[in-house]
Amino acid sequence: MHSMISSVDVKSEVPVGLEPISPLDLRTDLRMMVPMVDPIMREKQLQQELLLIQQQQQIQKQLLIAEFQKQHENLTRQHQAQLQEHIKLQQELLAIKQQQELLEKEQKLEQQRQEQELERHRREQQLPPLRGKERGRERAVASTEVKQKLQEFLLSKSATKDSPANGKNHSVSRHPKLWYTAAHHTSLDQSSPPLSGASPPYKYTLPGSQDAKDDFPLRKTASEPNLKVRSRLKQKVTERRSSPLLRRKDGNVVSSFKKRLFEVTESSVSSSSPGSGPSSPSNGPTSSITESETSVLPSSIQAEHLVSQQRLLIQDESVNLLSLYTSPSLPNITLGLPAVQSQISASSSFKEKQKGETQTLRPGVALAGQYGGNLPPSSTHPHVALEGKPNSSHQALLQHLLLKEQMRQQKLLVTGAVPLHPQSPLAAKERGSPGVRAAHKLPRHRPLNRTQSAPLPQSTLAQLVIQQQHQQFLEKQKQYQQQIHMNKMLSKSIEQLKQPGSHLEEAEEELNGDHSMQEERAPASSASIRAESSSAGEDDRIGQQVGAVKVKEEPPDSDEDTQTQQMESGEQAAFVQQVIGKDLAPGFVIKVII
């Protein structure tokens, strides 16, 4: 606007009558001739020119805006068209890519199908010769051996039916499992040669006694390779069963002396009938089970077995400790057990006692690999409580350990000296004198007997030890409660005696009556120490102050509690002296009856 105004000012200086195109007149004469224009007219002209210029500017603005809008619309249209074209191109590219991927997948699938078809063709080409070879092998195996074995089995079966020894076969049929366990040393291979001319090359019993799994020779479709495989499997099973690692599952303690006894007894029993094979199991050790009513081993044979068993226990160094398992897979712990010499001496004493008891033994059931019968509990040892089981080694272990503990306790009570080895933690801990207890407080190292270790058998021994500990604890608790009760009653009686006006004559009469009653009851001895004290009566006279305290002690039943009761009597005497030393009322009397 300032530029326009300046231009208007410039134009106002030019005279109106003159045209702008006309050349300027520089003459001064003419100017003097032109009359002067009025200022009012000049202002009007200027205003008109300003209005015209403003109108022109508005028109130009409108034109410019219209052109700008047109160009903007054109540009937006072009841009949209370009965007649409770009989107179309992208869509086309995506479609092309998808088509290419689909084509590639189809090609891969076709290739896989072709490869599978080729593999099928190759397999089909290779299978016919293999099938032919297998058929040829199956046809090449001859079944004549199977037929021969079946014929031999039928012939032997008919021969056994005709044999007169039917009772023995019936006895074996009752216990087929025992026959198999007793004769496990025989060969299980069906192709093995027979041991005698009359017996077949394999074990059998009456029909129905065996299980269905053991009847594999009767299969009509069985071939020679199948029989070989099954016989090998059976041999492996028997080897595994005979291994010492898997016998621990039965829970029985198996040792070397058992095996020796089994061999000795088997040889001695089988020597009576030398011509017997595996087909006559009545001569084995199981015949004593089925025919115990008719034919029973005499007691002298069982006594010899027991004596030989004890000799083997003493001589064999590998069976020094009866309380330990002899399996080589697990080590044994010998903590709390004595040395070898004490155990051998205890076992020898046990052997001498068993010699006297063999005359009264009842013939028990002897399983395969277990001999010795059932040992009844001896009357001289009431603490031994054995269960009625066929495991003689376990019973011998219990008796041996209990005898050892009894001998140790007797030595401690008689001599009162310190033992060679400290007591086991399961035994009674506080039965000895105070000097023995002080000696036991210091730990002593003992040389180990064996390098193997295994947990001790958790059986009746542990139960007996736990019962002993429980009884000792109950006795101590009773004694402690009795002492507390006696102290309370003494303190009460002292307080009542100090008070004036207490009636003491009736209390003295009651005490005399109680004393006479207790002297009558004295022959019937009891195991516990009773302390009775009388409370002051209500009707005693004033001026007489006479008190009485009575402590009655009776001899204990057993020699084991003598030391503890002596200590308690010493404590009671000290307590009575303390009571006497106190400032009591005049005329106070203490009566102690022992």
UniProtKB/Swiss-Prot annotation:
Taxonomic superkingdom: Eukaryota
Xref: Pfam families: HDAC4_Gln
GO cellular component: histone methyltransferase complex
Localisation per UniProt entry: Nucleus
UniProt keyword Transcription, yes or no: yes
Keyword field: Chromatin regulator, Hydrolase, Nucleus, Repressor, Transcription, Transcription regulation
EC number(s) per entry: 3.5.1.98
Enzyme class at the top of the EC tree: hydrolase
Catalytic activity: N(6)-acetyl-L-lysyl-[histone] + H2O = L-lysyl-[histone] + acetate
Predominant location: nucleus
GO molecular function terms attached to this record: histone deacetylase activity, hydrolytic mechanism; transcription corepressor activity
GO biological process terms held by the UniProt record: chromatin organization; heart development; negative regulation of DNA-templated transcription; negative regulation of transcription by RNA polymerase II; regulation of skeletal muscle fiber development; regulation of striated muscle cell differentiation
Biased composition (Low complexity): 267-288, 523-536
Region (Interaction with mef2): 143-193
Renumbered residue ranges of the record's region Disordered: 113-143, 187-247, 265-297, 495-571
Presence of the UniProt keyword Transcription regulation in the record: yes
InterPro entries xref list: Hist_deacetylase_Gln_rich_N (IPR024643)
Chain intervals with Basic and acidic residues compositional bias: 211-222, 236-247, 512-522
Known function: Devoided of intrinsic deacetylase activity, promotes the deacetylation of lysine residues on the N-terminal part of the core histones (H2A, H2B, H3 and H4) by recruiting other histone deacetylases. Histone deacetylation gives a tag for epigenetic repression and plays an important role in transcriptional regulation, cell cycle progression and developmental events. Represses MEF2-dependent transcription.
Protein family per UniProt: Belongs to the histone deacetylase family. HD type 2 subfamily.
Subunit structure: Homodimer. Interacts with mef2.
Protein name: Histone deacetylase 9
Originating organism: Gallus gallus (Chicken)
Lineage, uppermost ranks: Eukaryota, Metazoa, Chordata, Craniata, Vertebrata
This protein's encoding gene: hdac9
